[in-house]
Regions:
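A ubiquitous, low-specificity "background" feature that marks scattered single residues
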Residues: 8-9, 508
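Enrichment for repetitive, rod-forming helical segments
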Residues: 9-10, 94
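Hydrophobic h-region of N-terminal signal peptides that target proteins for export
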Residues: 10-18
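Sec-dependent signal peptide recognition
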Residues: 2-8
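Generic cytosolic/nucleocytoplasmic N-terminal low-complexity/intrinsically disordered segments
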Residues: 1-2, 567
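Glycan-recognition and catalytic cores of secretory/periplasmic carbohydrate-active enzymes
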Residues: 19-568
Length: 568
């Protein structure tokens, strides 16, 4: 009888705990309701638009503002920086059965097409354009000439095509038309002009150029990624064969210059055309030529080019953002995506072989030819740091765990698994196994609360159906809720002043719920995309802070203000 009473008491306690702790879908539902209420249009009375602010102070409800150098304030609403949220809204409708969230996402897309698409097809969004939620007027930092720019944004084209197929197709064509400066040699740039007259587009002639040919436009991979992704989706949804030809052609430009011995690279397939001279090493404008060559060339020779710099940040673009996007395209496009899968997995294997330090879970900073730059002291000022800066190995974080785990589900390769396994161990997740599902001993007491880790575990679970991975994902999900969900919003640090409505914690929790229900298709695949806003920002003392990014504002704790960055 005593045993029965104790058992009954334990059951009641567990039941009460369960009742007191909302399930993950309820949490995401609460969060989304808070976003739609507090980040919504509060400025237009009985006729509010469906638009949303990018950031919210959870304590006061104040919407995050951009302060221009002339002192004007604007409530920042940048649709390119809300694409993860759009995926959350659709996924929440799919899992909850409540269509209103998807309908809100559709309304936001429709509103942008109706009000913020120019004659060339481009939208008012991206790194240097946004909408002031107060006035509904397009805005942008003037020193960037209000150009169009996307970097690893990966808009939710699936939704956009479902809302307005022709407007989405117009945008993608306009995107390529504005950002490919010379189709014959594939000269691209991260900056595109609005209002451009449509050219020959997919019918343009092309002649393959040698690796690292000199151009005025800078072929950064983070900008190339969005071009590749958009044209591939245009082919998928609109059957424009030429779009896929050019998408794969652009993707290949980043493969052809890879070092022949190591297979590493590249971040750019061109180098900056030298158009002027300077004796000031600290002036890193691209008109003075390739910035890596200026800073590293005297010691390392002609291979020291920006495209060959395998440094922190650049490698995230190559082996995380690009990798996740191309792995997904490879799956979506079937036989047409086979090359994308091969290029991506080959690159990840090369990076694993030459850069990964399993002993301390770091990546070596390198040149693409394999030259290890660990602990190298910069001999002069330049693009990569001040004279005297020491280049250090950098941690292999959960974003790399995700890209290597996802690649392994496509190609079960031992080198890919070695990196995923090593990162997981270092990130407190325990032992993933000698291979997927073999000798598994995960740590179900982990304190890991990183949504990237959760996404990675879900990939491994979907590929292997090993329950241990799902159980560990649930634990990480619980940790996310207990440590990052405060005042009705998700924030990596509860002391932050503003919550970012595009944060990925609710996205990861929805993906987890979908996996538990065996409905993974209910939530869009995670691509690690993110928009941004950058430009001149007015400091409290009235000075202008050049090249301020919105993520710097999101990193401020309550009571903190931006510090000078000394950029010119």
């Amino acid at each position: 009888m005593k045993k029965f009473a104790l058992s009954l008491l334990a059951g009641l306690v567990a039941l009460q705990a369960s009742a007191a702790t909302p399930d993950r879908l309820t949490i995401v539902n609460q969060y989304v309701d808070n976003v739609l209420t507090k980040a919504g249009d509060q400025y237009h009375g009985q006729s509010p638009t469906p638009l949303l602010a990018d950031g919210i102070d959870p304590r006061t409800g104040k919407q995050m503002e951009w302060i221009f150098p002339d002192g004007r304030h604007a409530v920042l609403s940048n649709f390119s920086a809300q694409q993860n949220l759009m995926r959350v809204l659709v996924g929440l409708s799919n899992l909850s059965g409540n269509p209103s969230y998807k309908q809100r996402a559709e309304a936001i897309v429709k509103y942008h097409f109706q009000h913020y698409q120019d004659e060339s097809g481009l939208l008012i969004w991206g790194g240097h354009r946004f909408v002031d939620l107060k006035t509904l007027q397009p805005e942008g930092p003037s020193e960037k000439e209000m150009v169009h720019e996307l970097k690893n944004a990966y808009p939710y084209y699936d939704l956009m095509f479902s809302v307005d197929k022709e407007a989405t197709a117009r945008f993608i064509r306009g995107f390529w038309n504005a950002h490919v400066y010379d189709w014959k040699i594939m000269e691209t740039s991260r900056h595109g002009k609005y209002g451009q007259k449509m050219g020959a587009l997919w019918q343009s002639p092309f002649e393959q150029q040698p690796p690292f040919f000199a151009t005025k436009g800078l072929s950064f991979l983070n900008a190339g990624n969005d071009l590749i992704y958009s044209a591939s989706l245009l082919y998928k949804y609109n059957k424009e064969d030429g779009a896929l030809v050019w998408a794969k052609r652009l993707a290949q430009q980043y493969v052809l210059p890879r070092d022949k011995a190591t297979g590493l690279g590249v971040y750019q397939f061109t180098q900056a055309l030298k158009r002027d001279e300077t004796t000031d090493d600290a002036d890193t404008h691209s008109k003075y030529g390739d910035r890596a060559q200026r800073q590293f060339g005297p010691e390392f020779g002609p291979t020291a080019l920006e495209g060959n710099m395998m440094l922190k940040g650049r490698t995230s673009t190559i082996y995380s953002e690009n990798a996740l996007m191309q792995l997904q395209l490879g799956k979506d496009l079937g036989a047409e995506g086979k090359e994308l899968l091969t290029w991506t997995t080959d690159g990840l294997k090369a990076f694993a072989k030459y850069a990964y330090n399993e002993s301390d879970n770091t990546f070596r900073p390198m040149l693409a030819n394999g030259k290890d730059l660990s602990n190298y002291v910069l001999p002069r000022d330049g693009y990569y740091g001040k004279k005297g800066t020491v280049i250090k190995p950098y941690p292999a974080d959960n974003s790399f765990l995700l890209s290597y785990s996802r690649a392994y589900t496509v190609l079960p390769d031992a080198e890919l698994w070695r990196v995923a396994r090593g990162i997981a161990r270092a990130q407190g997740l325990g032992e993933l196994g000698s291979a997927a599902g073999k000798d598994v001993k995960v740590d179900l007491a982990t304190k890991n609360n990183d949504p990237y880790a959760l996404f990675a575990l879900l990939d491994l679970y979907q590929a292997s159906k090993v329950k241990d991975y799902l159980s560990l994902a649930e634990k990480v999900g619980d940790n996310i809720i207990s440590t990052r969900y405060k005042n009705g919003f998700f924030m990596a640090d509860p002391n932050r002043q503003y919550a970012d409505v595009d944060t990925i914690e609710p996205y990861a929790l929805l993906a987890l719920e979908a996996a538990v229900r065996n409905q993974p298709q209910s939530v869009a695949p995670f691509l690690n995309g993110a928009g941004f806003t950058e430009g001149g920002y007015r400091m409290e003392d009235g000075s202008t802070r050049i090249s301020t990014r919105d993520n710097e504002i999101f990193l401020l704790n309550v009571g903190e203000t931006l510090k000078p960055n000394n950029k010119k």
